[in-house]
């Protein structure tokens, strides 16, 4: 809603190159970049980047957590001081990483108020800049469940704000956003039982976050 020409590409299933010929000089690209892709970047320089968390994953390729972390942090490799990196304050690895990088760091937290950054205060998500406190949205207005999704909203809102999107557009977008397929995706309700598809929860951390998002007794139906 905030821009005429926006492309959502990358590790979500739409190759960046498949849309490159459609892009204009004023186009905005929202890209999910995998650790596999970050291994070989040379000139890639996002105006706004983010790392949401560091959890054990892809060790069949990276072999150690130290190497996996090193590769994930390459997203800021070419960023300058006028660029922005959004990081999870509650992730100790990312909090320390943010102390020693070139771009402006904006932290998010669902557990505490921050002197600067975006955080959850009661049921209100607030962005605090050097100059003001900006209410973004109340969690009750969101259509997605769970504290981890509140954190996702914080990260997305911060990225959009520092990319020049208005607070009004951010509020409208996060209120309208529904769960992406296979991630705590509402299916139906039968006989008072709500069914959710969370089949993308393929590592322990993702599965735990899905369970924590439920506010009623929960039964898991899993494949083998």
Regions found by a protein language model. Give the residues of each.
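Short acidic loop-to-helix transition motifs that present clustered carboxylates
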Residues: 12-16, 35-37, 92, 179
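Nucleotide phosphate-binding/pyrophosphate-handling subdomain across enzymes
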Residues: 139-224
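Walker A (P-loop) phosphate-binding motif
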Residues: 1-9
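Short glycine/serine/threonine-rich phosphate/pyrophosphate-binding segments
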Residues: 14-17, 33, 203-207
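P-loop NTPase switch/communication element
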Residues: 4, 13-26
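Flexible active-site lid/hinge loop adjacent to a nucleotide/diphosphate
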Residues: 22-114, 119-121, 126, 133, ...
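Cofactor-binding loop segments of dinucleotide-utilizing enzymes, especially the Rossmann-like FAD-
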Residues: 11, 110, 223-224
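Short active-site oxyanion
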Residues: 5-6, 26-27, 80-85, 192-195, ...
């Amino acid at each position: 809603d905030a821009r005429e020409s926006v492309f959502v590409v990358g590790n979500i299933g739409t190759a960046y190159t498949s849309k490159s010929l459609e892009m204009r000089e004023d186009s905005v690209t929202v890209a999910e970049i995998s650790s596999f892709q970050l291994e070989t970047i040379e000139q890639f320089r996002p105006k706004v980047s983010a790392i949401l968390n560091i959890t054990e994953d892809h060790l069949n390729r990276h072999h150690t957590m130290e190497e996996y972390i090193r590769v994930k942090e390459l997203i800021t490799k070419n960023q300058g001081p006028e660029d922005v990196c959004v990081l999870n304050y509650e992730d100790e690895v990312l909090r320390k990483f943010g102390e020693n990088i070139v771009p402006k760091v904006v932290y998010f937290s669902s557990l505490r108020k921050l002197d600067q950054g975006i955080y959850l205060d009661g049921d209100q998500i607030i962005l605090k800049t050097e100059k003001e406190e900006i209410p973004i949205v109340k969690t009750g207005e969101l259509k997605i469940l769970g504290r981890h999704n509140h954190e996702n909203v914080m990260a997305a809102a911060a990225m959009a704000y520092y990319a020049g999107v208005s607070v009004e557009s951010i509020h409208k977008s996060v209120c309208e956003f529904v769960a992406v397929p296979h991630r705590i995706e509402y299916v139906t309700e039968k006989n008072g039982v709500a069914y959710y598809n969370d089949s993308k929860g393929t590592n322990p951390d993702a599965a735990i976050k899905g369970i924590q998002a439920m506010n009623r007794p929960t039964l898991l139906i899993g494949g083998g």
